[in-house]
Amino acid sequence: MSQPRAEHVTKFVFVTGGVASSLGKGLTASSLGQLLTARGLKVTMQKLDPYLNVDPGTMNPFQHGEVFVTDDGAETDLDLGHYERFLNRNLSGNANVTTGQVYSEVIAKERRGEYLGDTVQVIPHITDEIKHRILTMDRPDENGVRPDIVITEIGGTVGDIESQPFLEAARQTRHDVGRENIFFIHVSLVPYLAPSGELKTKPTQHSVAALRSIGIVPDALVLRCDREVPEPLKAKIALMCDVDQEGVISCADADSIYEIPKVLHREHLDAFLIRRLDLPFRDVDWEEWDSLLRKVHEPEHELTVALVGKYIDLPDAYLSVTEAIRAGGFANNARARVKWVPSDLCQTEEGAEKELGNVDAIVVPGGFGIRGIEGKIGAVRYARTHRVPFLGLCLGLQCMVIEAARAAGITDASSTEFDPQTTEPVVSTMAEQMAAVSGEADLGGTMRLGAYPAVLDKGSVVAEAYQTLEVSERHRHRYEINNAYRQRITDGVGLKFSGTSPDGKLVEFIEYPDHPYMVATQAHPEYKSRPTKAHPLFTALVKAGLKHKNDEEK
């Protein structure tokens, strides 16, 4: 084992992609981060996104997938969710940088006169701002500890116009911090052509040539393929791309994303990187990860959880929710299969019965807008009347309150989000959100965002799940429960408002005490779930779902 260096020097690892998008750069980077963490190194991660939006907060979920919210209230790329889950640590908003943020800051500096009359250009001003944000990740954490490694994923594909400033900034970073402190990983596609029965290396060769043409020579290549890349082909790629053969990594499609760290370790990527960067290390501690993989591949139980959503045509729109459901399964030594249910199909009792009659638990996640709302409310009604375990998230809580109010006799109960003129606004716009909703203020970045505390009622279902009375969860919403209706709803159907903000003004948790498990939260607990440490609300949901399944089978 090598000895720690006397002077701390942070190393920077850049992950780029070529040939095609959606190759799994984020999962590759996350898995490498998990491996290096398991070797005792302090790792942090960052995503550079080459789109002009300041953040993904106002982007269509069908295009971008979910928006991942950090503790400090940043709306970020879904890859940050992978980073947090694989590293088992919280990241800040600094971990996601967009072209929109960079240009906004540079233009603001120009208006303030900070460039002293310079002609502001992509090089050096834009690239300098990008480098500043990369190097910012080297700052000490809350415990005063600096990272050993910063892994930065550069979004997009090599050759894209919009990615060029980020790639140039990465190239310059190598010059600024020293070549011995930088490691470039290029993720590339090796397609299999069925008619000829061949794996083709030419796309990777062209992709690496494009990368080299802008001054970046990759230290390692991660070859994505639907099968293992044989050694002779790896040797050919190493020769043609001028990469050490031990730096050519085969990464075939895996049955579970949680197998990828094992795949990269088997190919010795972590050992190769550590040697090249002269990092101190220990052997990989696989105990926790092996325990996870046993639960992934050899669960004792199975159940089906319905996810009733508006954006199910793109599963990435609910990525953290589905991973939290699966993690809840792992915590119960069970395989939780997700059944995707379009919310529109659950509007009627017959439709809900058809879609939800064979499931063991139901989740209604967050979302925006009126489309599909009555179907979500129908799913809530089905869960309540058929005593199916249920968890509502953000909008799911609001739908649960609307359904409860209607069941309590407030037949016109609705939300001002869906019906601004409703006579029974059981869900209403938060006071500080009125300007954004009316169009007088910006929509982007103005919601109630980030971690907020809540106080739970002693003896409540949620307090039992959390095993504490004080919790903190991440939020992303503009609407809240109208307190004027709380008592009427409780008296009418027995719904309990079991958790609020510390001042008691904002409803954070609700539940039916006499239901096997029917809970909802205004927060997004899925963001804090980890594969090795499931979120308590999802663990409790799966536990109740397994009991429901066993009771149904008797």
Swiss-Prot record:
EC number: 6.3.4.2
Spans annotated as Amidoligase domain: 1-279
Chain sites annotated for binding ATP: S22, L23, G24, K25, G26, L27, D79
Residue positions binding UTP: S21, K200, T201, K202, P203, T204, Q205, K236
InterPro entries on file: Class_I_gatase-like, CTP_synthase, CTP_synthase_N, GATASE, GATase1_CTP_Synthase, P-loop_NTPase
Top-rank taxon: Bacteria
Annotated binding of L-glutamine, by residue: G367, L395, G396, L397, Q398, E417, R478
Keyword tags: ATP-binding, Glutamine amidotransferase, Ligase, Magnesium, Metal-binding, Nucleotide-binding, Pyrimidine biosynthesis
Single GO MF annotation: glutaminase activity
Quaternary structure note: Homotetramer.
Function: Catalyzes the ATP-dependent amination of UTP to CTP with either L-glutamine or ammonia as the source of nitrogen. Regulates intracellular CTP levels through interactions with the four ribonucleotide triphosphates.
Similarity field: Belongs to the CTP synthase family.
Name assigned to this protein: CTP synthase
Species per Swiss-Prot/TrEMBL record: Corynebacterium kroppenstedtii (strain DSM 44385 / JCM 11950 / CIP 105744 / CCUG 35717)
Name of the coding gene: pyrG
